[in-house]
């Protein structure tokens, strides 16, 4: 709406000089909640498109796609992801966890891992073990997402952002790791998770921070509602 209104304002401003009346002169542009706009920047469909388009033809590309899976299925902050080592990838009975040691609260957190992410992590670990002739124990002290296995230095924030930005270019969007965190939170809200569940999943200390995802859900639901056809029944 704002785009159309802006175009009309520009058009009529030029026509005013010819004595024509400007019908949109005093109409103000709608205020846009930039926070909500940022939250809705990346959808689960966008993630699927990136996965389908991303060509895995090297060790780094294998690492990068595993990063995307991890960001989406855990909602991790960048710092939490970059400090992960293979020793933090744990199995208890039939369940897998990440031990997060660099959380915003300063406390260790055990985060359950979705089965789809477990599959991707297992594939990635086996790939590295095969490529470098290592066993599981050899990888324990290695960063999961390093510059290279031999160097064993964690990726920098700048490198992580560049990786996600390059992926975003595949779908014509300028995105960041935090946009992926927004995407999973919004998806959880749309799937029926309540505000406390989303707060705990994301590691928020206050539900006020989480409320933006509930508001985002309302906007998406309204958009869906607007697509419903009208049903006009004749009154008897």
Feature roles, as predicted:
Residues 1-236:
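Conserved catalytic core of the tyrosine transesterase superfamily
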